[in-house]
Amino acid sequence: MYLYGKYRRFNNNHEGLKKLKALIDRQNEPVLVAYESTGWLSRILAMQLLSMGISQVCLNPSRVRNYARAIGVQAKTDKKDCEMIARFAEQTHAQANVTESPVLMRLKELQSSLNFFKRRMAHAKSSLSAQRDKFLIREIQRAITHDEKQIARIEKEMHKLIKTNQEMQERYDYYLSLQGIGPNTALALISQLPELGQMNRRQVASLVGLAPYNWDSGKMTGKRMTRMGRKGIKSLLYLSVTSLLRLHDHPITKMYERLKLKGKKTIVAMVACMRKLLIWLNAETKKWLSEKNYA
């Protein structure tokens, strides 16, 4: 930790966080704890900080690293990293994260584990098709069976968790009522995109990583490209679009066909359809939330 020019180290557990809180309480002005998103480690920290009522902000690691390079800092050590995080948060006037409920935070943790097992199972299935050794084939099949059971257990736990929260259950049921949205996508929208319905079309496309960015220089006009964003949501939107393309009269199908007739590459047409589906979902959710609050 870097605070007022001094470095300190705390364990990422309850005892370590108690010492951190004691230090923060001794300060004469409010303290905002800034940290980088590092997967499950940062989620543990977020839950601990939330339980102690400490203001926090989770930062994008690539933005912090780019800031360090911009000011000429090439070295990367724990001490230098925490200093760069603190300076970046100060220079950009970082605002505290909107407090998430413990239910949502646990749902995110379960979704992260679910994505891990799905990726591992997909990799195992891919390697199985190219495997010739009988022993390894049996071992891979056993691993796939294990992952399938783990996925089923985690999904069951996620459904149980959603049922404990009326707002989440209502949102889940609403998403399922929309064409092209299945149980997996509905779960992911709740856990990985809770902001849906609270942003405009540009904001939601940028957040998910489906907003096209210019790549121009002088007289050169480069191809527009999408980057970053929430990969889990993008993958599920891709599957949703693939499902909707089977419906010949659906607006997504018509848009895809128009783009292909114009000579657009398949991936370009798919991303455009994913963006259209996301913007539609955002607009429909915004309308549903408005009607729900008005009622």
Predicted features along the sequence, with ranges:
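Gly/Thr-rich phosphate-binding beta-strand-loop-beta motif of the actin/hexokinase/Hsp70
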Residues: 1-3, 85, 187-188
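Acidic beta-strand-to-loop metal/phosphate-binding motif
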Residues: 30-38, 85, 241
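Acidic, metal-coordinating catalytic cores used for nucleic-acid/nucleotide bond scission
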Residues: 34-45, 225
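Long, charge-rich intrinsically disordered scaffolds of nucleic-acid metabolism proteins
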Residues: 47-50, 57-178
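Short, solvent-exposed helix-loop connector elements
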Residues: 95-108, 132, 221-224, 254-271
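Acidic, carboxylate-rich catalytic segments that either coordinate divalent cations
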Residues: 248-295
